UniProtKB/Swiss-Prot annotation:
One of its GO terms (biological process) is negative regulation of T cell proliferation. The active site is at 63, 106. Exists as a monomer in both solution and crystal states. In the presence of SDS or probably in the presence of phospholipids, assembles to form SDS-resistant stable oligomers. Residues 1-16 form the signal peptide. Is abundantly expressed in Tokunoshima and Amami-Oshima P.flavoviridis venom, but is missing in Okinawa P.flavoviridis venom. It is thought that loss of BP-II in Okinawa P.flavoviridis is due to lack of necessity for a strong toxicity exerted by BP-II in the venom as far as they feed mostly on frogs. This is Basic phospholipase A2 BP-II. GO terms for molecular function: calcium ion binding; calcium-dependent phospholipase A2 activity; phospholipid binding; toxin activity. Pfam families: Phospholip_A2_1 (PF00068). The lineage of its organism: Eukaryota, Metazoa, Chordata, Craniata, Vertebrata.
Length: 138
């Protein structure tokens, strides 16, 4: 029951590219993003930061660093266009430069998570934030 409540809280106020990110993750990994990665390790999910626990968590760390480089839009809220062609993510060419960057960040993390499915460890699925050690800066 606690897990369902946490997932409901994560979904409240979700908009824009966050929904697109979750869709990309599902397309690449076959895993429901909020359920499997919403509180994974120290870096997956909103407001989480710390030394990565494994390669899966490292994907999220790199994604946060990618978002930090984006200027001119809100990576978590502003929508962009992309398509799924021949089992590949294709960011829309008509996206403004900022949203093109956001799409590429999201595409990279989705692919990284797929490439590291073998490192996914259920013990990190709902990992307590206090157990995370300070991470290096991006």
């Amino acid at each position: 029951m606690r897990t369902l409540w946490i997932m409901a809280v994560l979904l409240v106020g979700v908009d824009g590219s966050l929904v697109q990110l979750w869709k990309m993750i599902f397309q690449e990994t076959g895993k429901e993003a909020a359920k499997n990665y919403g509180l994974y390790g120290c870096n997956c999910g909103v407001g989480r930061r710390g030394k990565p626990k494994d390669a899966t968590d490292s994907c999220c760390y790199v994604h946060k660093c990618c978002y930090k480089k984006v200027t001119g839009c809100n990576p978590k809220m502003d929508s962009y266009s992309y398509s799924w062609k021949n089992k590949a993510i294709v960011c829309g060419e008509k996206n403004p430069p900022c949203l093109k960057q956001v799409c590429e960040c999201d595409k990279a993390v989705a692919i990284c998570l797929r490439e590291n499915l073998g490192t996914y460890n259920k013990k990190y699925t709902i990992y307590p934030k206090p157990f995370c050690k300070k991470a290096d800066t991006c």
